[in-house]
Design a protein with these regions (language model features):
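Interhelical loop/hinge segments that connect adjacent transmembrane helices in multipass membrane
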Residues: 1-23, 62, 66-77, 196-198
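Interfacial transmembrane-helix starts/ends
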Residues: 6, 74-88, 96-100, 119
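Interfacial/gating helices of multi-pass transporter permease domains
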Residues: 4-8, 12, 29-50, 113-116, ...
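Membrane-interface helix-loop junctions in multi-pass transport and translocation proteins
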Residues: 37-39, 98-102, 116, 145, ...
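Transmembrane helix-bundle signature of multi-pass secondary active exporters and lipid flippases
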Residues: 19, 42-61, 93, 122-132
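Membrane-interface junctions at transmembrane-helix termini in multi-pass inner-membrane proteins
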Residues: 124-153
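Interfacial segments at transmembrane-helix termini and the short loops linking adjacent helices
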Residues: 99-127, 172
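Helix-loop junctions and terminal segments of transmembrane helices
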Residues: 49-74, 137-140
């Protein structure tokens, strides 16, 4: 039995649990600061762009075996090109959604048309998701220290941004926090990846 793998798995599970809790913190804080109606608008606005997260999960499932079996040197040779190609695909999907969102809301959520602009803005936050390749490399290569730094920074910055932006900007503060949080997480992923040692 490989006890190092068991220990690593426990650490990853702990980090994932923390991330899940923080991911839902926006809804708790919106309800606390703004009330039930803004929470409903935000939740509905988030529901359609959030489907891109399913794409991200499928992507990580597909690439993980390759990242696990490849050397860091090999990954470095191709990761930036792959990230760019995935980014362009995401950009096309997001641009299409932004253009069609008003029509979609008139059809599916006619009573929540105010949520359409919020939803369009939230979709922009997913432009940063292709950098998941960098964090998945750290995961696949069992870089525990870097994963801890990334997760603690990402989760801490998300909470801080929500606390700073929600009171003055309302629902839009949550939108800004989501976009900025994703941008900071992506930047941290790239920086930590570049600092990995073979």
């Amino acid at each position: 039995m490989d006890y190092s793998n068991i220990s690593y798995g426990k650490h990853v599970s702990l980090l994932n649990i923390i991330s899940i809790v923080v991911f839902h913190a926006d809804k708790v804080l919106i309800y606390h600061y703004l009330g039930a109606v803004p929470l409903a608008i935000y939740s509905i606005a988030f529901s359609l762009p959030a489907q891109l997260k399913v794409v991200s999960k499928m992507l990580t499932t597909l690439i993980f075996p390759k990242l696990s079996s490849s050397s860091l040197e090999t990954i470095r040779a191709t990761i930036y090109d792959k990230t760019l190609r995935i980014f362009l695909a995401y950009a096309a999907i997001i641009a299409t959604y932004i253009v069609t969102a008003p029509l979609i809301f008139r059809w599916i959520f006619p009573q929540y048309l105010d949520a359409a602009p919020v939803s369009q803005a939230l979709a922009l936050g997913y432009l940063f998701h292709p950098t998941v390749l960098f964090s998945q490399t750290m995961f696949a290569q069992k870089r525990q220290k870097e994963l801890y730094i990334l997760k603690l920074f990402t989760n801490g910055s998300r909470i801080l941004l929500l606390l700073l932006l929600l009171p003055p900007y309302g629902v839009w503060g949550a939108v800004y926090a989501f976009i900025l949080g994703n941008a900071l997480s992506s930047a941290a992923s790239i920086i930590l990846f570049r600092r990995l040692r073979i």
